[in-house]
Amino acid sequence: MNGAESPHDVVVVGGGLAGCEAAYQLAQRGLRVRLVEMKPHRRTPAQTSDRLAELVCSNSLRGAALSNAVGLLKEELRRVGSLALRCADETSVPAGGALAVDRERFAEAMTRAIEAHPRITVEHREVTEIPAERPVILATGPLTSDALAASLAAAVGAEHLAYYDAIAPIVSADSIDWSRVWKQSRYGKGGAVRGDRAAQREQTAQPERAAPPEDAAERRDDAEAGDEAYVNCPFDEAQYKAFVQALVASEKVEARAFEEVRYFEGCLPCEVMAARGEQTLAFGPMKPVGLTDPRTGRRPYAVLQLRPEDEAATAYNLVGFQTRMKYAEQLRVFRMVPGLEEAEFLRMGSVHRNTFVDAPALLGPAMELRALPGVHLAGQIAGVEGYVESAAAGFLCAILLAQQLRNEPLRPPPPTTALGGILTHLGRKQPTYQPSNITWAHIAPLDPAHGKLRKRARYEVMAERALRDLDAWWAAG
């Protein structure tokens, strides 16, 4: 997939994993690239080094096994010539079943490869507005400067740009105890029972509580959701109170000095809501109005709802339960939820500083802003989460842009691959778009002809299919 020298110039803004990967892949395809990085003249509050591709938090690139979605993504990146994976493998350190790197040597290797490439020129200056040059890739990361973020917001609409993420956990469908839950959207949409308020009062043994003012909005949300019913995990009063107490008492992740997270009232961490009062959640995301447990014919005291994460409903997210609890605490507390006692968590919840756009609303198939042709986004600003995913997004943005510049039909990786799954996530419309690590829910499910497989076996078959399809796609290029 390498090409001859090209007259096209591409500007890449940001020298992190996504920007470096994008610049390298474009240069490998014969394009002259100008990579603009503001260090050493200015650093984000998280940065301490002047090198490119600085890993500011963990040195781990997470699990290596192919039965792990990120492990599959790493293997795919190796097979397509990723610079980040090559440097990671060269600078790896012992980490059990994970791929971890010596972060100093890794950054040195990435910087050396970029600076030595004959078709890449590195400029050190700050970019405070979207450059006039086209095409341009913005890969400015989660701590994009206020000035550049303001320029982007002015171009796409402030409502489509977020300054921190609020991620709820995701559980696998296979791990839900379906004997304890039921499917129904509020007021009977997609479920069994619809009734007026008087009928609901007759069906429940608990006193009627005033409905919150957002009921009308939730009715609209349910109508827009079509026939896709939520999964409802019911609580009695004792279970609810114990759950709230556990949320309040749980250990939380301390905000890093550079984050300065300011919560929006409409997207508070669940433990913050719980701390405001015992009934806050019961009048918020856990309110049971419009829901009837078919096993009892009554409305539960409280309900935690799960929403499908993918079309095949192989995974569900915990609606409204974005959290800053430590991961071990999330496992302990969320397994108190009826039906989730043995839940497998595909993604843990988090809340942290993160500048990103509403990718499904804004980006076209080449990761290009529909409102600004020639402006492409890569990395965390597009809505991926994690080192490996950022490098993957840089790779994808580069190869799609290269195809576009050559007037070739776009040839994205198949949706059966992890690389294709990154694009699936960026294009999948959600009620509230949030960044995500790669999960199996982003990858096309197996054909039903495979029959019922145990979880690990299913993932292994999906990985085999992914690598087979990836190799065929890559060879055809």
From Swiss-Prot:
InterPro entries from the entry? FAD/NAD-bd_sf (IPR036188), MnmG-rel (IPR002218), MnmG_N (IPR040131), TrmFO (IPR004417)
- What ranges does the record give for the region Disordered, renumbered to this chain? 190-224
Q: Which UniProt keywords apply?
A: Cytoplasm, FAD, Flavoprotein, Methyltransferase, NAD, NADP, Transferase, tRNA processing
Say if the entry is tagged with keyword Ribosomal protein: no
- What's its EC? 2.1.1.74
GO BP terms, alphabetized: tRNA methylation; tRNA wobble uridine modification
Q: Which terms does the record give in the GO molecular function aspect? A: flavin adenine dinucleotide binding; tRNA (uracil(54)-C5)-methyltransferase activity, 5,10-methylenetetrahydrofolate-dependent
Cofactors needed by this protein, per the record, are: FAD
Reply yes or no: does the keyword NADP apply: yes
Q: What is its main location?
A: cytoplasm
Protein name in the entry: Methylenetetrahydrofolate--tRNA-(uracil-5-)-methyltransferase TrmFO
* Originating organism: Sorangium cellulosum (strain So ce56) (Polyangium cellulosum (strain So ce56))
